[in-house]
Amino acid sequence: MKPVWILAKLTFREAMRRRIMLAGLLLGISFLIIFTIGFHYILAQIRIELDAEMPSQGMARIANAEIMNGFEIMGLYAVAFLSIAMAALLGADTLAGEINSGTIQTIVTKPIRRSDVVLGKWLGFAGLLGLYLLLMAGGVVLSVFLQTGYTPDNLARGLSLIYLEALVVMTITLLCSSAFPALATGGIVFGL
């Protein structure tokens, strides 16, 4: 089992150095900045309109909570999309690229089972996707909380479902990457 963890650690490090990860991080940070600024201005406009239309504090508070919940769900939906795209892009050329370049031959000649190689890559990418999802979802939730004081119910359940969705896409990507070239893998996964 030790070779699996070594390969997972090496896969994690390798993926962190790839340009696609840098692009994903820049895209994620850009999204968080735009979401925070947009949410601030939308929230200010909604509060002005709610105060004018609803003199009752109770009704205004309920409407405000519903609106905050809706915008937070929209932000988390975008996080889910970015996580799934990252899962598909990270694994698309992993095994196919190593097979084409011949680097996989130096790994599998060692006394390591092929299933350990694939499992190690899967665990490395799973850890990276989990970290990416936590950073992105944490940014959305923190942005909404700092501006409104609102925290959603069942956040852990929702994030775990987003993570499982990303893991399924990553698993399909690694499966296709072991049998097809990188371009075909990307086409299959994004076609799903």
Where are these regions (language model features)?
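Aromatic- and glycine-rich beta-strand/loop motifs that create alpha-glucan
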Residues: 1-25
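A helix-boundary/kink motif common to multi-pass secondary transporters
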Residues: 17, 100, 113, 180-181
